[in-house]
């Protein structure tokens, strides 16, 4: 039996296979192992994600380890915890999986997953149920961008029946996830109850939905092409979206621009209602307002007549973080990243009698380099164009009770290095 995967997609010599141990990924890995024998220079690895949702999860790890050992494929096992509020179990598990994939990928390596034609049909129907437009109805692409590399689905044109046939011919063994029989999950409901009925009436229903998905993808690609100049005109060098150029646009054109801007931020596809709210409640809010629309773990805000896509974070104005070993990086609270003092810069290092800390507010009048006279911190933020949501999350370096610098923004006159080896105050952000 010849390989059923689309070998034309496999142009990379480094491949990471998402391997759950189920039928689909077992057939995919088996075919890739065979393909590797024809292409000896290929480096093949597998990754199994342990969600901890099933009592059988440890047994599945053992099964995958045994299979990979037999086929001489290095296996990475990633254990994840699901704790993303506001998402269902399915969405949480998927998010955790793909985060694990992104962490595990090596430079130059591509991710290969085992979705097939029946999966594509289910994805299309789920998008239809949500009322999606062409972008959502495009379902899954055979090749897409992911984590700075590519995600490849070489079985997307094959039915589950073809995979079963392959597995039986080669006497493959796979695991059965008991949750796949739980039709309280939308995808399982479609797989177990709806799609079999549709295919009984129309045997080529899955192929037809795949064609519709491909046509939607084609239309979406054409829209991308036609709107590219508009998007470039509206987008600032910082990646924000300027409101004024969109004021004269039709509602449909404006919504399409906002959707494409969000796609460029790797944001989840917003609903039609969310697009209306972004424009009405954020972009068109009164001038003296600080509008904010929460979308999952992120927010859309307006500042200086621009829309900003940022990760939600709790203000830290009351927080004081001691930095006793200031020669080492300091982890900041609330997922803000880390700071460090690097050799070379215009900030004086602390004296031996000065306790170092990071804070997020500073009282009194401040004297910063490049400005005459004293100003309160709020006024400095305004003059320097620092957005409101960064004002109580930007790390402030203190020696004792003296403000020395704001990371990446300013240095105070008390913090200037004079005739000595200076340091720089560097903030490694983890936020958008």
UniProtKB/Swiss-Prot annotation:
One of its GO terms (biological process) is tRNA wobble base lysidine biosynthesis. It is an enzyme of class 6 (ligase). Keywords: ATP-binding, Cytoplasm, Ligase, Nucleotide-binding, tRNA processing. One of its GO terms (cellular component) is cytosol. The keyword ATP-binding applies. It catalyses: cytidine(34) in tRNA(Ile2) + L-lysine + ATP = lysidine(34) in tRNA(Ile2) + AMP + diphosphate + H(+). Its main location: cytoplasm. Its EC number is 6.3.4.19. It is found in: Cytoplasm. The N-terminal region contains the highly conserved SGGXDS motif, predicted to be a P-loop motif involved in ATP binding. Ligates lysine onto the cytidine present at position 34 of the AUA codon-specific tRNA(Ile) that contains the anticodon CAU, in an ATP-dependent manner. Cytidine is converted to lysidine, thus changing the amino acid specificity of the tRNA from methionine to isoleucine. This enzyme is essential for viability. Belongs to the tRNA(Ile)-lysidine synthase family. This is tRNA(Ile)-lysidine synthase.
